[in-house]
Design a protein with these regions (language model features):
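Short regulatory "switch" loops immediately downstream of catalytic or recognition motifs
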Residues: 34-40, 87, 121-124
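Acyl-donor binding region in acyl/amide transferases
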Residues: 93-172
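Intrinsically disordered, low-complexity, positively biased terminal segments
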Residues: 2, 59-63, 83-88, 126-127
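Residues in well-ordered beta-strands of folded domains
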Residues: 14, 83, 117
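Short, His- and charge-rich active-site/binding loops that engage polyanionic ligands
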Residues: 73-104
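Short, P/G- and charge-enriched loop/turn segments at secondary-structure junctions
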Residues: 52-57, 101-105
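Short amphipathic alpha-helix that is part of the acyltransferase structural core
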Residues: 2-55, 61, 66-76
Protein backbone atom coordinates (compact mmCIF):
# COMPACT_ATOMS: atom_id res chain seq x y z
CA UNK A 1 0.00 0.00 0.00
CA UNK A 2 1.17 3.51 -0.73
CA UNK A 3 0.35 6.68 1.16
CA UNK A 4 0.80 10.04 -0.56
CA UNK A 5 2.94 12.27 1.66
CA UNK A 6 3.70 15.20 -0.68
CA UNK A 7 2.38 16.56 -3.96
CA UNK A 8 4.20 18.84 -6.37
CA UNK A 9 3.33 20.21 -9.79
CA UNK A 10 4.58 17.23 -11.82
CA UNK A 11 4.77 14.41 -9.28
CA UNK A 12 3.89 13.09 -5.84
CA UNK A 13 5.94 11.31 -3.21
CA UNK A 14 4.54 8.21 -1.55
CA UNK A 15 5.53 6.21 1.50
CA UNK A 16 5.18 2.57 0.49
CA UNK A 17 5.32 -0.87 2.07
CA UNK A 18 6.44 -4.35 1.01
CA UNK A 19 3.61 -4.64 -1.53
CA UNK A 20 5.56 -2.35 -3.89
CA UNK A 21 8.87 -4.24 -3.74
CA UNK A 22 8.46 -6.14 -7.02
CA UNK A 23 7.56 -3.00 -9.00
CA UNK A 24 10.28 -1.07 -7.18
CA UNK A 25 12.87 -3.75 -8.00
CA UNK A 26 12.01 -3.57 -11.72
CA UNK A 27 12.42 0.21 -11.68
CA UNK A 28 15.72 0.13 -9.78
CA UNK A 29 17.33 -2.55 -11.93
CA UNK A 30 16.29 -0.89 -15.19
CA UNK A 31 17.51 2.54 -14.04
CA UNK A 32 20.82 1.10 -12.85
CA UNK A 33 21.35 -0.54 -16.22
CA UNK A 34 20.51 2.71 -18.03
CA UNK A 35 22.94 4.74 -15.92
CA UNK A 36 25.81 2.31 -15.39
CA UNK A 37 25.81 -0.50 -17.92
CA UNK A 38 23.84 0.28 -21.06
CA UNK A 39 22.52 -2.67 -23.00
CA UNK A 40 22.15 -6.15 -21.56
CA UNK A 41 20.19 -9.33 -22.23
CA UNK A 42 16.61 -9.32 -20.98
CA UNK A 43 17.26 -12.63 -19.21
CA UNK A 44 20.00 -10.95 -17.15
CA UNK A 45 17.63 -8.11 -16.24
CA UNK A 46 14.98 -10.62 -15.16
CA UNK A 47 17.52 -12.45 -12.98
CA UNK A 48 18.68 -9.19 -11.41
CA UNK A 49 15.10 -8.10 -10.71
CA UNK A 50 14.42 -11.43 -9.01
CA UNK A 51 17.62 -11.07 -6.93
CA UNK A 52 16.80 -7.49 -5.86
CA UNK A 53 13.22 -8.45 -5.02
CA UNK A 54 14.38 -11.36 -2.86
CA UNK A 55 17.00 -9.26 -1.09
CA UNK A 56 14.52 -6.45 -0.37
CA UNK A 57 11.89 -8.86 0.95
CA UNK A 58 14.53 -10.47 3.20
CA UNK A 59 15.62 -7.06 4.55
CA UNK A 60 12.11 -5.62 4.96
CA UNK A 61 10.93 -5.13 8.54
CA UNK A 62 8.99 -2.90 10.92
CA UNK A 63 11.61 -0.14 10.65
CA UNK A 64 11.78 -0.06 6.85
CA UNK A 65 10.75 3.07 4.99
CA UNK A 66 10.31 3.10 1.22
CA UNK A 67 9.71 6.36 -0.64
CA UNK A 68 8.58 6.44 -4.25
CA UNK A 69 8.18 9.41 -6.58
CA UNK A 70 5.41 8.96 -9.15
CA UNK A 71 4.21 11.21 -11.92
CA UNK A 72 0.50 11.87 -12.30
CA UNK A 73 0.23 8.81 -14.57
CA UNK A 74 1.52 6.57 -11.72
CA UNK A 75 4.90 6.00 -13.42
CA UNK A 76 7.79 5.67 -10.96
CA UNK A 77 10.31 8.50 -11.35
CA UNK A 78 12.46 7.86 -8.28
CA UNK A 79 12.92 5.81 -5.15
CA UNK A 80 14.89 5.37 -1.96
CA UNK A 81 14.69 2.91 0.92
CA UNK A 82 15.99 3.05 4.49
CA UNK A 83 15.85 0.43 7.23
CA UNK A 84 17.12 -0.03 10.76
CA UNK A 85 19.68 -2.83 10.69
CA UNK A 86 19.06 -5.63 13.20
CA UNK A 87 22.83 -6.35 13.43
CA UNK A 88 22.29 -9.92 12.23
CA UNK A 89 21.03 -9.83 8.65
CA UNK A 90 23.85 -9.50 6.14
CA UNK A 91 23.89 -5.98 4.73
CA UNK A 92 24.60 -5.30 1.05
CA UNK A 93 27.71 -3.45 2.32
CA UNK A 94 28.97 -6.72 3.81
CA UNK A 95 27.98 -8.82 0.81
CA UNK A 96 29.59 -6.52 -1.77
CA UNK A 97 32.63 -5.10 0.07
CA UNK A 98 33.04 -7.31 3.14
CA UNK A 99 32.52 -4.32 5.46
CA UNK A 100 30.67 -4.94 8.72
CA UNK A 101 29.65 -1.67 10.43
CA UNK A 102 30.10 -3.28 13.85
CA UNK A 103 33.79 -3.71 13.09
CA UNK A 104 34.31 -0.61 10.95
CA UNK A 105 32.46 1.94 13.13
CA UNK A 106 31.20 0.80 16.55
CA UNK A 107 30.00 -2.42 18.12
CA UNK A 108 28.48 -0.66 21.15
CA UNK A 109 24.79 -1.59 21.37
CA UNK A 110 23.78 2.05 21.92
CA UNK A 111 24.48 2.79 18.25
CA UNK A 112 21.89 2.23 15.52
CA UNK A 113 22.76 1.59 11.91
CA UNK A 114 20.36 2.65 9.19
CA UNK A 115 20.97 1.30 5.71
CA UNK A 116 20.00 3.64 2.88
CA UNK A 117 19.71 2.08 -0.53
CA UNK A 118 17.68 1.45 -3.65
CA UNK A 119 18.16 5.06 -4.65
CA UNK A 120 17.29 5.53 -8.30
CA UNK A 121 15.96 8.38 -10.41
CA UNK A 122 14.70 8.34 -13.98
CA UNK A 123 16.90 11.05 -15.49
CA UNK A 124 14.73 11.14 -18.63
CA UNK A 125 11.62 12.18 -16.68
CA UNK A 126 12.18 15.88 -17.34
CA UNK A 127 12.30 16.76 -13.64
CA UNK A 128 15.43 17.98 -11.85
CA UNK A 129 17.26 14.90 -10.61
CA UNK A 130 18.98 17.04 -7.97
CA UNK A 131 15.63 18.23 -6.61
CA UNK A 132 14.30 14.67 -6.51
CA UNK A 133 17.51 13.50 -4.84
CA UNK A 134 17.28 16.16 -2.12
CA UNK A 135 13.63 15.42 -1.42
CA UNK A 136 14.12 11.65 -1.28
CA UNK A 137 17.28 11.89 0.81
CA UNK A 138 15.63 14.29 3.28
CA UNK A 139 12.91 11.70 3.87
CA UNK A 140 15.37 8.81 4.14
CA UNK A 141 17.60 10.47 6.73
CA UNK A 142 14.80 11.65 9.04
CA UNK A 143 15.13 8.74 11.50
CA UNK A 144 18.92 9.03 11.41
CA UNK A 145 19.42 12.74 12.04
CA UNK A 146 16.92 12.66 14.89
CA UNK A 147 19.15 10.29 16.89
CA UNK A 148 22.72 11.19 17.90
CA UNK A 149 23.52 7.49 18.19
CA UNK A 150 22.57 6.62 14.63
CA UNK A 151 24.76 6.06 11.62
CA UNK A 152 23.80 5.91 7.97
CA UNK A 153 25.48 3.17 5.96
CA UNK A 154 25.20 2.87 2.19
CA UNK A 155 26.99 1.71 -0.92
CA UNK A 156 27.46 4.77 -3.12
CA UNK A 157 29.58 5.72 -6.10
CA UNK A 158 32.03 8.63 -6.14
CA UNK A 159 29.58 10.94 -7.93
CA UNK A 160 26.89 10.44 -5.29
CA UNK A 161 29.51 10.79 -2.53
CA UNK A 162 30.42 14.24 -3.89
CA UNK A 163 26.75 15.26 -3.85
CA UNK A 164 26.35 14.00 -0.27
CA UNK A 165 29.41 15.99 0.82
CA UNK A 166 28.14 19.10 -1.00
CA UNK A 167 24.87 18.80 0.93
CA UNK A 168 26.80 18.83 4.21
CA UNK A 169 26.77 15.14 5.11
CA UNK A 170 29.85 14.02 7.01
CA UNK A 171 31.02 10.93 5.15
CA UNK A 172 33.67 8.31 5.63
CA UNK A 173 34.74 5.28 3.70
Amino acid sequence: MEKRIATFEDYSIFKADAECINELSRFIVKENYKHHIGSVKSSQIADDIADVTKEELDLYGDNTYIYIVRDHHEKILGSIRVFLWNRQTELPLEKIYGINPLKAIHSDKKFNYWHVGRFAIDSAAGISTFTLFKRLMALAVQPIVGDNNSYMVAEIDSKLLKVMNALGFVTGN
